[in-house]
UniProtKB/Swiss-Prot annotation:
Protein name: Maturase K
Main location: plastid
Taxonomic lineage: Eukaryota, Viridiplantae, Streptophyta, Embryophyta, Tracheophyta
GO biological process: mRNA processing; RNA splicing; tRNA processing
Compartments (UniProt record): Plastid, Chloroplast
Molecular function per GO: RNA binding
Signal peptide: none
Protein source organism: Ranunculus glacialis
InterPro entries in UniProt: Domain_X, Maturase_MatK, Maturase_MatK_N
Length: 508
């Protein structure tokens, strides 16, 4: 127990005080605003995905003045039908405060991260931030495993648990009290804690950064215990099993059970010890894979449920964890459908006068694009209908033609960029077709013309924004095979500059 306490307190030695005054600094809200607009290449800005950009320094100054006047109840009023001062909706001020909170609470953790990199080569760890860095790991490890636990991570049953966890890292009582007040008065919290949707409610787009940080920190606390137990599994489980064995000898009344347990003692220990266990997480989903038996996976399943409910007060249910076999199950993770498929090959072996033909089946990770959910995401963004028929984008008709083409072309390139690791890239042709024809319909609507006449007038130059895609990038990365376009289209490439999933590709 003392070792466990030292493990938990190891990373908490750098607590930060006096975070509350930062909430009244204008540059904090500027940082929060810039965070949403300066993402990596695959992430579109808020304007591209039709989110309103309402940030201004004048609004921030008025918000800070109102906070100095201690009129928080007015700012966080639940009545969304009324307008706050100068015609701005109160929801805007609530969202700005949450963005400021998100920047401030990240400061202690950012300082701890910087200090951990002191004296180390940070450049080598940057690539590990990419979402695509997970898939090379899956290609190396998953092909040798048998079963997988598909886990929907639960969320805390009460928001006070989030504040209590932060008390271990932040000692500014004023900031924590204001944080608690904000959580209780925040008008969207009831919708964030409901279970009416299958999606984890803490990942809704509105004020996502703030609640996502609180949720990830809560999960981090539970995972720290889990990883500690995993690292110490050999010692802890062996000790526990030996104690149980001594107890059976002490009672000594069930002779048959004594003999069976003694003979299969090493087998029982193997059921608990699994050196081929792998675990990774993204958003509200985690994957645990193993080479062990289904019995071992069931033990891990109920162990996680009891750990969440009894020690961390997560609202968890066993049906949120599914045990599947990798050979006949598609893993829905990070926008891909991944599965392990045997790749048969024939090897001819010549030994003197005898020749042998050997059939070999090597497991291979198969990653495909979930075309139906992706079309549904495009339909939600008003690029097509639910059946995949392209439609125009009326909201963009006020923009210049070059901006419209640039927006559609950027989204098309980003989709190709993210799904460059797909095993079957032909499924992307339909997505590109939807975006190209939606762009043509938008331009034709703007100029009050038909799509056919508009395309005839522009000719092939119209498609240049869409055609400069993966082929040219791959020919630069893989010059040796650039002459073979057929082989080039089958190559899977994972990029290390993707740190966030585009909203169109976030199918969770």
């Amino acid at each position: 127990m003392e070792e466990l306490q030292r493990y938990l307190k190891m990373d908490r030695s750098r607590e930060r005080d006096f975070l509350y005054p930062l909430l009244f600094q204008e540059y904090i809200y500027a940082l929060a605003h810039d965070f949403g607009l300066t993402k990596s290449i695959p992430y579109e800005s808020m304007q591209i995905l039709s989110y309103d950009n309402k940030y201004s320094s004048l609004i921030v100054k008025r918000l800070i003045i109102r906070m100095y006047q201690q009129k928080h109840l007015i700012i966080l009023d639940n009545d969304s039908n009324q307008k706050n001062f100068l015609g701005h909706n109160k929801n805007l001020y609530s969202q700005m405060i949450s963005e400021g909170f998100a920047v401030i609470v990240e400061i202690p953790f950012a300082l701890r991260l910087v200090s951990s990199y002191q004296g180390k080569e940070i450049e080598k760890s940057i690539n590990l931030r990419s979402i695509h860095s997970t898939f090379p790991f899956l290609e190396d490890k998953f092909v040798h495993l048998n079963h997988v636990l598909d886990i929907l991570i639960p969320y805390p049953i009460h928001l006070e648990l989030l504040v209590q966890n932060l008390r271990c890292w932040i000692q500014d009582a004023s900031f924590l009290h204001l944080l608690r007040f904000f959580l209780y008065e925040y008008h969207n919290w009831n919708s964030l804690t409901t279970q009416k949707t299958k999606q984890n409610p803490l990942f809704f787009k509105e004020n996502r950064r703030f609640f996502l940080f609180l949720y990830n920190f809560h999960v981090y606390e539970s995972e720290s215990i889990f990883l500690f137990l995993r690292k110490k599994s050999y010692h802890l489980r062996s000790t526990s099993s030996i104690a149980f064995l001594d107890r059976t000898h002490f009672y000594g009344k069930i002779e048959h059970f004594q003999v069976v347990f003694r003979n299969y003692f090493h087998t029982i220990l193997w059921l608990f010890k699994d050196p081929f266990m792998h675990y990774f997480r993204y958003q509200g989903k985690s994957i645990m894979s193993s080479k062990g038996t289904p019995l071992l996976m069931k033990k891990w399943k109920y162990y996680l449920v009891n750990l969440w409910e009894c020690h961390f007060y997560f609202w968890s249910q066993p049906d949120r964890i599914h045990i599947n076999q990798l050979s006949n199950h598609f893993l829905d993770f990070l926008g891909y459908l991944s599965s392990v498929r045997p790749n048969p090959s024939v090897v001819r072996n010549q030994m003197l006068e005898n020749a042998f033909i050997i059939d070999i089946a090597i497991n291979k990770l198969d990653t495909i694009v979930p075309i139906i959910p992706l079309i549904g995401s495009l339909a939600k963004a008003k690029f097509c209908n639910l059946s995949g028929q392209p439609v125009s984008k009326p909201a963009w008709t006020d923009s210049p033609d070059s901006d419209i083409i640039d927006r559609f072309g950027r989204i098309c390139r980003n989709v190709s960029h993210y799904y460059s690791g797909s095993s079957k890239k032909k499924t992307l042709y339909r997505i590109k077709y939807i975006l190209r024809l939606s762009c043509a319909r938008t331009l034709a609507r703007k100029h009050k013309s038909t799509v056919r006449s508009f395309l005839k007038r522009l000719g092939s130059e119209f498609l240049e924004e869409f055609l400069i895609e993966e082929e040219q990038v791959l020919s630069f990365i893989l010059p040796k095979i650039s002459s073979s376009s057929q082989r080039l289209s089958k190559e899977r490439v994972w990029y290390f500059d993707i740190i966030r999933i585009n909203d169109l590709m976030d199918l969770s």
